């Protein structure tokens, strides 16, 4: 059976997501993928420069010292930290941990994830700088 009645389609502008802070923050969080792509491409170019010898590596290091690239990399770091923060806040919602017949709150899980991140960062920096 078919009908000739047209369903009502509510008009929606292309900027509908700008009206609510939740959606604006959601778009910002999802936008952190763009700086991640930048960093991935930069890392791949660094690996190729490392493979191609000292001259190529020196050129890559000069590229990284450009003030514009430093600013872009700082923006990338901020985006990565924002993404990490929101991801760590979502993790406790996926884990249902029960201790003594009570559901564990999100704070210990979030703090544990940040502690692991800090320890891993310190270990990686130590290995990179002193090994």
UniProtKB/Swiss-Prot annotation:
Name of the featured protein: Fumarate reductase subunit C
Function of the protein: Two distinct, membrane-bound, FAD-containing enzymes are responsible for the catalysis of fumarate and succinate interconversion; fumarate reductase is used in anaerobic growth, and succinate dehydrogenase is used in aerobic growth. Anchors the catalytic components of the fumarate reductase complex to the cell inner membrane, binds quinones. The QFR enzyme complex binds 2 quinones in or near the membrane; 1 near the [3Fe-4S] cluster (QP is proximal to the [3Fe-4S] cluster, on the cytoplasmic side of the membrane) while QD (the distal cluster) is on the other side of the membrane.
Keywords: Cell inner membrane, Cell membrane, Membrane, Transmembrane, Transmembrane helix
Record localization: Cell inner membrane
Record field: transmembrane: 22-49, 66-90, 105-128
GO biological process: anaerobic electron transport chain; anaerobic respiration; bacterial-type flagellum assembly; fermentation
Membrane topology: Multi-pass membrane protein
